[in-house]
Amino acid sequence: MIDNTNFARNIKEPEILFTNDSTSLYLYLEKIRRNSFDGFISFDSDENSGKINLQGYAKVSLNNTFNTGEKINFDFKSQKNQDRSLNSSVIFPYFLGSPFNLKYSLNLIQKDSSYTSNENSVDVELNLNKVKVGVGFQKNESYSDSQIEFIENFNSKLFNVSSEYFIADSDDKLISEKFRLLVKYGTGKKIQLNNETDLNKYKLELIKKFNFSSRFKLLSSIVKEKINSKNLVNNELIRFGGSNSIRGFDDNSIFADGYTLLATNLNFFLNDTIYIYSIFDLANYTNSILDLDQDIYSGGIGFSTLTENGVISINYSKGNNWGNSFNLKNAKINVIFTTFF
C-alpha cells in the first residue's frame, strides 16, 4: 500500500516486535519529493503564413505538502487560437482517518468568444488496497452569447460511479506507472432550450508498462470515451488531442462524441537517467454533429533525462489522417520541463 502512494516508499521490510503485553510494528519509510512544476513550450508553423506559433501551459502538483497525504493539482493551458482551460483538483486521502478519499474538481474552458463552460464535481472513493471504488456528483454549465451554429446554452447533472486499479513502480524514477485500469460511468439529465433529455457518459482507461529488459520498456495505453444524448452541441462534446492524448495535434483540438485511442512509447534507456523513445498513436473518433467517423494517427521520436532537480523531455511528433502519406512537415516540437521541489 505504501509503495502505491506517490509521496513515500519502503526502504526496508517492516518489522514486528512481540513482547509479553504488546505488539509493535516498525515501518522504515522515506519521503519522496513529489511536488512538481511543469513548463511546456510548443512550436509549430502556420501552414498559410509560415509564421512560428507559440503555445504553452503551467502545471503545478503539490503532494503531501502538509503531511496529510493531500494532492493539489493545477493545470492551465493557453493556445494560439485563444482557447484557454483550467483543470484543478484537491484530493484528501483517508479523510479524517477513514478509508475514504474525498475529491473536488473544477474545470473551466473558454473557447475564444464562442462559449464558456465550467464543470464542478465531488467524489468519494473507498480505498481497498490497490483498488478504489467511488461515487460522485458532477455539474456542468455552458454559456454562449454568439449565434454560432451547433453551440447552445445548456446545463447538466450526472451521478458517477467509478473503479480504479493501480500499481506503481517506485523503483523507476522516470516511468513510475506500472499498471492502471479505470472504469467510469455517469448518468443524468441535460437541460437545453428548456427541454430535459437523458445524458450518459462512460470512460475506460488502461495503462500498462512492459519491461522487456533493463533497457527496453514499452509504455502503452488504451482510452475509450463516449457521450450519449439527444441534440448534442459542440460545447458539450469530448475534447482530446495533444501531449496528453494523441500527440502531433493541437491540445484539445478534436471534438468528438466518442473516441478510442491507442498510445505507445517504445523506450530505450541509455542509462538510469536518460532514455530515447519512439511515438506511435492511433485513434478513431466520431462526431455525429458533423457526421464524421475519422481514423487518425501520429508518429515521432523523443528524449527524456532525469536531472538533480527534475525531468527534461523533448519530443518531435506529427499527426495525420489515416490514409494520408506521412511527412514531418508542420510537425510539433514539445519541450517539457518538470521541476521537483
Language-model features and meaning:
Residues 44-49, 160-270, 278-279, 286:
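C-terminal outer-membrane beta-barrel translocator/porin domains of Gram-negative envelope proteins
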Residues 1-182, 210, 239-242, 252-256, ...:
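Gram-negative/organellar outer-membrane beta-barrel architecture
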